[in-house]
């Protein structure tokens, strides 16, 4: 029974997954497609956590000489006997994953690179004594293993030439050209960009790829994966037989991520069919080529949690697996037009953008449109259509936030940004606090409207009215807590005959403040909403808790909101 199989949470080693009997969503058609759409160098660009590393590990297991062919028993590729006979286990493979090449300095990142290369060199230790190699070639291999103080000795030139040298030695040993697999090729560039050594890392990667992929006569073919397609002029200079399979390409569009039918089968296998709608709402929505796919990391993690707790709620697994600095970068640079576009996305609408798929990292901040492009290629936005630009042969993409989880990324980043904005605006906060204490409804409304005019709304326009009211309640609560740290503020606590939205206990022991929040669908309804709030305070006797504590001077406010405007009514009871 499939539901007795372990779920591969965090397992990206194909051999381990198959030998240890983990559940596997069959992606071996990738092998067939790769060979039928052959290119000397193929780059797959996909967002984080979409199965890139597992697929690369699967390719290694298929092509590598001496592989255990039983790993593929019962999988799609085993049905193509002719292809398996010709290619399975027939090539030496070099496999590097660059996902851990990082450091605060270039030297730290270089050492991390050397450790990864050294691990692969050590795996090929049989070359040191190969009788197919000349003594000079054996010494060349041993030159890659020289240690000093427990660390491999590599300089830049040695690292750059290492892949090409290993290819040559493996070809000499086996009499077969080499398959090179490089996973997460752009992580070192991303980290270098973030930490200020981008040019040095570009030089290193360009040199390594130039020798390994361009002038390597011992190369059968190479496959690379990453999140971004770095422009050919930056990294892949001179590569002629080079294909890029991005998220817009229909080829291979179902081989990274789970399709709807695969998710339905997974849920059925574990007896969780009833959770289909929530899984789709939270983790589906990505459009690669002509395929609609789910994030596999999310689906596997959620099903695993459901096995332990049938009442488990969807979580933001993808968000928590790494940083979300791109969204924050967009928000920090947003002008009024960009803020409006973000609000439309949050509300579930589409925006239209011309997308560049071949940026370099050092171009990301050149224009705000470049940030939109990177948000698209890294999975924060997805395409639902195209629009032809006027007087042009070019097209703009219609972009949306793919699902609830990614919407949560935007919401959380906007909230953090807004907290920082509020914390740094002492003048507005002081005026807000003073207006409340002085019962100055005009100044209070003006300051609230100023603040809301600067914010990015995270209001879901499709949400029911009570949820919209909750949004404004949370917004006001955050502002009040930032306006006067000496106030004791209680939210939605029981008082009198019901629950008051907000109770404030200032330093003055005689003074108490009650605030009721209302949502109005239209601006013309703000007056009536304020009146309803004031009537509710009196009818429900929300002031009783404060009076029971000896606070005899009570100020009450009804505050009504509509979009980015509010109206305030106040009274002393």
Pin down the residues of each PLM region.
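Short regulatory helix/loop adjacent to the ATP-binding pocket of P-loop NTPases
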Residues: 214-219, 230-248
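Domain-level recognition of nuclease-like catalytic cores that cleave nucleotide substrates
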Residues: 545, 549-573
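Conserved P-loop NTPase mechanochemical-coupling segment
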Residues: 9-18, 101, 108, 112-160, ...
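Substrate-engagement module of ASCE P-loop NTPases
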Residues: 121, 162-173, 200-220, 542-545
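P-loop NTPase motor core
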Residues: 10, 26, 61-126
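Extended alpha-helical interface modules used as scaffolds for assembling large macromolecular complexes
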Residues: 242, 294-541, 566-573
